[in-house]
Regions:
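Short amphipathic alpha-helical segments, especially helix-boundary/capping motifs
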Residues: 1, 20-26
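Extended catalytic/binding region for NAD+/ADP-ribose chemistry, centered on the ART fold
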Residues: 29-53, 127-131
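Short helix-loop boundary/capping segments at the starts of domains
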Residues: 52-60
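Active-site and NAD+-binding cores of ADP-ribose-processing enzymes
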Residues: 2-18, 31, 59-154
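Short, flexible, solvent-exposed loop/turn segments with mixed acidic/basic and small polar residues
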Residues: 24-29, 57
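A sequence-level detector of short, solvent-exposed, charge-rich linear segments
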Residues: 26, 48, 65-69
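Glycine-rich, charged/polar anion/phosphate-binding loops
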Residues: 22-23, 52-53, 98
Length: 154
């Protein structure tokens, strides 16, 4: 079993695996209007992936973390850096990376995708398709309180 992690606002704990956030906002790996759940290969990377979008005004938000167990029988599709467009790390994200994952979401080939992190390319983000049939096989942990260390808020 492979483990992935997700961090979400505590007020969305019951909705953290619906993919509803993707309906309202685009992300590096999807177009707005698509259900997707973002996870990461480590808890530290999950924290960084959230924290890069925050500033001091967000210091009072309550967060939760989820452990995600991906059983061996659940296929994981992977995109290697060599398969990505030259602009894949640009900020803001370009449409080229959004289209790659959007095609994967539409295809329904796998519930789990592994892509390099734009923050730390040697590590992986784990987009999850909550509408794919294997999604129900994932072991979604209970929400646990998560707190960003106060030294991070500069």
């Amino acid at each position: 079993m492979i483990t992935a992690w997700r961090i979400a606002k505590a007020r969305y704990r019951d909705d953290a695996f619906s993919g509803n956030g993707g309906l309202q906002n685009a992300g590096r790996w999807h177009l707005q209007g698509q259900r997707v759940v973002y996870g990461a290969s480590s808890l530290a990377l999950a924290a960084l992936e959230v924290f890069v979008h925050l500033n001091r005004a967000h210091a009072g938000i309550r967060w939760v973390m989820f452990e995600i167990g991906i059983p061996d029988e659940v296929p994981i599709e992977a995109l290697a850096k060599a398969q990505l467009p030259r602009t894949w790390r640009h900020n803001p994200p370009t449409g080229s990376t959004m289209r790659l994952d959007s095609e994967w979401l539409r295809s329904g080939r796998a519930a789990v995708l592994r892509v390099p992190s734009a923050i730390i390319p040697a590590e992986s983000n784990i987009p999850i398709n909550p509408q794919q049939t294997d999604f129900g096989k994932l072991k979604l942990g209970r929400p646990q309180a998560f707190e960003f260390d106060s030294r991070l808020w500069k």
